[in-house]
């Protein structure tokens, strides 16, 4: 058998390897060679990865080529790379299907590997599931609605395969526990010969499982049951047939097998690299699947009916953490997914479940120490990769150290992967924006235009907004500089709508493309009506608006937040000669942005007062041609976020609110009072969230919907742990 370390470094097989058949050794060698080569992309060595994978033609090599293209596609969202990824993944799926049928057909042959845990051909079924899952993600990112719909059917097929593999693991663990129980109950009261026989029961579990698996394949065809057999599920995944359908659209996934998730890579049950591949791969894929589905915003909820199952964020995260333990390609990709989720999504959302201390911390909070250890491990494994440096920068920003985050991305070293370089520059652009470093921000976003074609209208828009801020800063003190910045601002503002709508997501225009085009049209109409220049027709600081939409406030220190308030104050200053002409819409935007900053400053009373003023107005004031119809639903979410942060449990973890008055300053006197106080806060929070979730279609609803979905899940989790008597 092989230890886990042989996965990447090709250690010599153990002495007993000679007893294995040639075919099983060839399969193992193909797996190790393919995964070793594909792993090079996580160290920014795409040429080495492609060259290594080109040396083989096995299903594992085909999958490796697909994975390499998938990583590049999801990093850059470029159509040509996504097409290449789709083609490679389809080839990998077909190749794995052929090998799966071959393995099942030859399952009785002595020259095949017989896993103690998995049925014959499971490794190739997993290859299909990985290809289907990655192909589905690429399909969703595709501009074609047809491809996007097909993607959801691929998710169904991948789900059924992965669920079947998990059932095999569950069955194996149950048999192992039963064998151990028999051994422990008989060892003290039976003859030594029988004790010896009992002790062999556990060690012979491989043959027992193998035999049962073979019997199940025949039994299922003869007598199908409501709980479709694992073998039948795997057989149903033939590419020539119709998409597999779950028995019940609302079925409950296989319960998570906590026992096997407690096993580290050096456990005795992971002695063969094929089993390691299946276990780590199935946990990674199923974990990603459950996590992604749990994050779907309300506006896309109808698509879930195509899939027929629901996400489970907590379970998905546990499975991803398990996959990240393994020193292979899967472990590296799982680590990247984990870090991206916590430093990206969690820090983007404002209402998340409370942290619960435990053995490994709480997967749904922000396990900072655990994340730091994981990142350090990846930096050690892949020292040449800018990808992990990027993750370190994101982690610094997520923990309110934006200066360090920006510094890490301003080095001289560049990644040979264009997609990683584009991500680095984009993150640098955002950090510069949060820090109000306008010239660096503008230059960086203009650099993004050349590196990535995903949302060029947004890049031009933010570059123009930066020069607008610089124009406003010097308008009254340096007319020459002001004129220069005004010219550049207008130039980039006018370029933005010309490239909007070039990209599609599930056949829909990108949310920010729609936003940018409308904003420009609104300003142009105002400039004509007011007879002023375009830059003087712009309302509330668009950079502060962008900081809000990217949730930059959660990454900023109090000092940086105060700077945002100063920038917002310009609108009502004497320098703004058009403020008296503004209607309730622009004034509501100013109040909303100020409320968001005050919430981040933990001044909830002031924040709620501003929001109440917005919500007290007629909602029709914010609807109509060229208007910002997102104001009211976002104000509802902001109110919910304030209420969530006022709870005693939240305060115990993050500190108390900083109120400027004694209003609402009294704290509950007893534990019972505290629970009632918190329950009331959660109840009100939920009311605002439900209104936001049920709001009619509005601009940026998909983006805001991500936060609303996460928030509703957090509230439901709180309610499940605090049931009413």
From Swiss-Prot:
Keywords: Cytoplasm, Nucleus, Phosphoprotein. It is found in: Cytoplasm; Nucleus. Residues 187-209 are annotated as: Disordered. It comes from the Eukaryota. The keyword Phosphoprotein applies. GO terms for cellular component: cytosol; mitochondrial outer membrane; nucleus. Interacts with lipid droplet proteins. Belongs to the IML2 family. Inclusion body (IB) resident protein that interacts strongly with lipid droplet (LD) proteins. Involved in LD-mediated IB clearing after protein folding stress, probably by enabling access to the IBs of an LD-stored soluble sterol derivative that acts as a chaperone in inclusion clearing. This is Inclusion body clearance protein iml2. The gene is iml2.
């Amino acid at each position: 058998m092989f230890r886990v370390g042989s996965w990447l470094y090709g250690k010599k097989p153990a002495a007993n390897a000679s007893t294995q058949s040639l075919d099983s050794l060839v399969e193992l060698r193909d797996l190790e060679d393919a995964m070793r080569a594909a792993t090079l992309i996580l160290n920014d060595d795409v040429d080495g990865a492609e060259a290594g994978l080109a040396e083989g033609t096995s299903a594992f090599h085909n999958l490796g080529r697909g994975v390499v293209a998938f990583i590049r596609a999801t990093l850059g969202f470029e159509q040509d790379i996504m097409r290449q990824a789709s083609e490679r993944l389809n080839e990998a799926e077909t190749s794995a299907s052929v090998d799966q049928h071959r393995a099942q057909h030859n399952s009785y042959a002595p020259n095949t590997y017989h896993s103690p845990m998995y049925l014959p051909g499971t490794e190739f079924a997993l290859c299909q599931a990985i290809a289907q899952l990655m192909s589905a993600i690429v399909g969703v990112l595709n501009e074609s609605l047809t491809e996007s719909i097909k993607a959801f059917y691929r998710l169904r097929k991948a789900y059924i395969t992965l669920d079947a593999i998990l059932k095999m693991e569950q069955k194996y663990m149950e048999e192992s526990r039963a064998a151990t129980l028999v051994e422990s109950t008989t060892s003290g009261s039976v003859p030594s010969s029988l004790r010896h026989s009992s002790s062999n029961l556990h060690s012979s579990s491989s043959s027992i499982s193998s035999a049962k698996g073979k019997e199940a394949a025949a039994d299922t065809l003869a007598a199908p049951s409501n709980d479709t057999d694992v073998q039948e599920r795997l057989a149903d995944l033939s590419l020539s047939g119709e998409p597999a359908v779950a028995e019940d659209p609302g079925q409950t996934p296989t319960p998570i097998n906590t026992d096997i998730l407690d096993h580290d890579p050096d456990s005795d049950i992971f002695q063969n690299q094929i089993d390691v591949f299946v276990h780590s791969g199935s946990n990674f894929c199923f974990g990603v699947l459950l996590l992604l589905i749990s994050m779907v915003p309300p506006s896309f909820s109808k698509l879930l009916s195509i899939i027929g199952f629901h996400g489970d964020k907590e379970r998905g995260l546990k499975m991803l953490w398990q996959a990240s333990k393994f020193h292979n390609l899967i472990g590296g990709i799982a680590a990247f997914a984990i870090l991206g989720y916590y430093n990206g999504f969690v820090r983007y959302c404002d209402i998340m479940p409370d942290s619960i201390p435990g053995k490994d911390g709480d997967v749904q909070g922000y396990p900072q120490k655990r994340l730091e250890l994981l990142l350090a491990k990846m930096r050690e494994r892949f020292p040449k990769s800018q990808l992990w440096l990027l993750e370190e920068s994101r982690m610094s920003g997520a923990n309110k150290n934006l200066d360090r985050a920006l510094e890490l991305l301003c080095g001289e070293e560049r990644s040979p992967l264009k997609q990683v370089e584009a991500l680095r520059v984009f993150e640098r652009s955002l950090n510069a924006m949060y820090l109000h470093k306008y010239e660096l921000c503008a230059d960086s976003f203009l650099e993004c235009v050349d590196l990535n074609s995903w949302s060029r209208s947004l890049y031009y828009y933010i570059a123009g907004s930066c020069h607008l801020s610089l124009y406003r800063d010097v308008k009254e003190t340096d007319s020459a500089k002001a004129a220069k910045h005004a010219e550049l601002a207008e130039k980039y503002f006018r370029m933005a709508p010309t490239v909007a709508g070039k990209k599609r997501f599930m056949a829909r225009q990108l949310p920010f493309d729609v936003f940018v085009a409308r904003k420009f049209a609104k300003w142009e109409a105002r400039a004509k009506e007011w007879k002023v220049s375009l830059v003087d027709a712009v309302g509330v600081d668009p950079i502060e608006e962008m900081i809000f939409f990217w949730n930059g406030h959660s990454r900023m220190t109090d000092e940086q937040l105060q700077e945002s308030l100063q920038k917002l104050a310009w609108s009502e200053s004497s320098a703004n000669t058009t403020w008296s002409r503004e209607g309730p819409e622009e004034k509501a935007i100013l109040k909303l942005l100020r409320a968001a900053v005050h919430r981040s400053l933990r001044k909830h009373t002031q924040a709620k007062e501003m929001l109440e003023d917005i919500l007290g107005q007629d909602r029709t004031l914010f609807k109509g041609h060229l208007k910002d119809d997102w104001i009211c639903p976002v104000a509802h979410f902001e109110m919910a976020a304030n209420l969530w942060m006022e709870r005693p449990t939240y305060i115990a973890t993050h500190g108390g609110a900083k109120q400027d008055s004694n209003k609402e300053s009294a704290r509950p006197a007893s534990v019972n009072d505290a629970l009632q106080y918190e329950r009331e806060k959660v109840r009100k929070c939920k009311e605002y969230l439900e209104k936001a979730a049920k709001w009619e279609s509005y601009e940026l609803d998909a983006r805001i919907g991500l936060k609303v979905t996460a928030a509703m899940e957090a509230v439901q989790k709180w309610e499940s742990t605090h049931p009413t008597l």
